[in-house]
């Protein structure tokens, strides 16, 4: 009787662990369409990004290393993004 309960516990534990791993991987692998397409503006010291309703605003995204920025933002008509002085820029 104990071995049957133990087997069921292990089975459901493995199922729940598998589900959690799949959910975690799915949330990390976002498509590039979810990453905003930003640019630069002479009046903006940060990134010039679209918001809801088609309006643009100046935002700042902080970064620690060069690899952080491509996960946060895409650049329109320029190379990059890259990390400069702790902020992502295009």
Curated annotation (Swiss-Prot):
Q: Does the keyword Disulfide bond apply?
A: yes
Supply the alphabetized keyword list: Antimicrobial, Disulfide bond, Fungicide, Plant defense, Secreted, Signal
Q: Which GO terms describe its cellular component?
A: extracellular region
* Disulphide bridges: 63-83, 69-88, 75-90
What span is annotated as the signal peptide, if there is one? 1-26
Q: Which GO terms describe its biological process?
A: defense response to fungus; killing of cells of another organism
Question: Could you tell me where this protein is found in the cell?
Answer: Secreted
Q: Tell me its family.
A: Belongs to the DEFL family.
Task: Report what the protein is called.
Answer: Defensin-like protein 293
């Amino acid at each position: 009787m104990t071995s049957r309960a133990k087997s069921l516990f292990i089975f459901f534990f493995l199922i729940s662990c598998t589900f959690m791993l799949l959910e975690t991987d799915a949330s990390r692998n976002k498509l590039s369409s979810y990453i905003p397409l930003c640019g630069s503006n002479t009046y903006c010291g940060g990134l010039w990004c679209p918001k809801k309703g088609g309006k643009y605003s100046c935002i700042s995204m902080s970064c620690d290393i060069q690899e952080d920025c491509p996960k946060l933002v895409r650049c329109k008509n320029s190379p990059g993004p890259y990390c400069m002085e702790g902020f992502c820029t295009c």
